[in-house]
Amino acid sequence: MASASLQTEISKFMSYVLRHAPHEVGLTLDPEGWVPFEDLKKAVFTRFDVTDADVLEVIETNPKKRFTLMGDRIRAAQGHSVDVDLALAPATPPSQLFHGTTMESWTAIQNAGLKKMQRHHVHLSADTETAKIVAARRKGVHIILEVEAARMHSEGHSFFVTDNEVWLTDHVPSQYLSPISGAES
């Protein structure tokens, strides 16, 4: 069994490869982001001294559920900068969703809303605890934003939900956003 720190390194490597740079290890994603699992394992084995069981453990125990394993194929659940179509069906969101960010970013967000930046979608959480975890990855004073998802949806905005329960949309205009009082972390 790989140590926790090695599991984290493997997870980050696989995420990087599957989301951003499959070409760096000789992989080619299909249009929906899938690669043969055997091919990904070969790439992992060239970088880490681990077993098949170690790689499976990284996938199965990853707290962020970053990977989707289906049969003999694997892909990143979301977060791609390379061109993929995750083939997600539109979904009806809950009344509110949440986004973790920083006070510094909130200034720009108030003007332009939440933008997808280099990703294909804006990522939203179904609960404040997950949003706090996301915010904690950023430097600065953290803040949780509430998204009026049901109102957005009723006004024509599309939402999708990934296998690991991350909600996606193209853009969140600022009129649907408000900071949650006391949610700073």
Curated annotation (Swiss-Prot):
GO terms for biological process: tRNA splicing, via endonucleolytic cleavage and ligation. Keywords: NAD, Transferase. The keyword Phosphoprotein does not apply. Disulfide bonds: none annotated. Its EC number is 2.7.1.-. Coiled coil: none annotated. Removes the 2'-phosphate from RNA via an intermediate in which the phosphate is ADP-ribosylated by NAD followed by a presumed transesterification to release the RNA and generate ADP-ribose 1''-2''-cyclic phosphate (APPR>P). May function as an ADP-ribosylase. Belongs to the KptA/TPT1 family. It comes from Rhizobium rhizogenes (strain K84 / ATCC BAA-868). GO terms for molecular function: NAD+ poly-ADP-ribosyltransferase activity; tRNA 2'-phosphotransferase activity. The keyword Nucleotidyltransferase does not apply. Pfam families: PTS_2-RNA. This is Probable RNA 2'-phosphotransferase.
